[in-house]
């Protein structure tokens, strides 16, 4: 098999994962996109390892060993990441990244701006709302 096929597939997987990280707002979908990017890297590692071992006629397979190590680290990462997302969802009631960022900064995104001073008397405010 030619090296271009897995390299193109790996690039497509990585770009799909990158789009998911940049476009999604749900934390679980972002974690899934990161895993897709890691799998694209693993595919690239294995493809280049096979290609280089055929060219050099060696059977070291260090790329495949590195891929197994990466899979183990990714499994631990997704386990911890999902645990954190579930804990945050239980406490805050949402897993939307933008809403979590706004609540962490201490202000509501849809609320009025509190930096501007109030102008007018109470009678003017009551008249404006009526």
Swiss-Prot record:
Q: What GO terms in the biological process aspect are recorded for it?
A: ATP synthesis coupled electron transport
Q: Which InterPro entries match?
A: NADH_UbQ_OxRdtase_chain4L/K (IPR001133), NUOK/Mnh_C1-like (IPR039428)
* EC number assigned by the record: 7.1.1.-
Give UniProt keywords alphabetically: Cell membrane, Membrane, NAD, Quinone, Translocase, Transmembrane, Transmembrane helix, Transport
Q: Which GO terms describe its cellular component?
A: NADH dehydrogenase complex; plasma membrane
Taxonomically, which superkingdom?
Bacteria
Q: Where in the cell is it found?
A: Cell membrane
Q: Which reaction does it catalyse?
A: a quinone + NADH + 5 H(+)(in) = a quinol + NAD(+) + 4 H(+)(out)
Which regions are flagged for Basic and acidic residues bias?
Answer: 97-110
* Entry GO MF terms: NADH:ubiquinone reductase (non-electrogenic) activity; quinone binding
Q: Which EC class is the enzyme in? A: translocase
Q: Where is this region: Disordered?
A: 97-130
What membrane topology term does the record carry? Multi-pass membrane protein
Give me the stretches of Low complexity compositional bias: 114-123
The record lists the membrane-crossing segments as: 3-23, 28-48, 68-88
Q: What HAMAP family does the annotation carry?
A: NDH1_NuoK
- How does this polypeptide assemble, per the annotation? NDH-1 is composed of 14 different subunits. Subunits NuoA, H, J, K, L, M, N constitute the membrane sector of the complex.
Q: Which family does it belong to?
A: Belongs to the complex I subunit 4L family.
* Cited function: NDH-1 shuttles electrons from NADH, via FMN and iron-sulfur (Fe-S) centers, to quinones in the respiratory chain. The immediate electron acceptor for the enzyme in this species is believed to be a menaquinone. Couples the redox reaction to proton translocation (for every two electrons transferred, four hydrogen ions are translocated across the cytoplasmic membrane), and thus conserves the redox energy in a proton gradient.
Q: Which NCBIfam families match?
A: PRK05715.1-2 (NF004320)
What is the designated name of this protein? NADH-quinone oxidoreductase subunit K 1
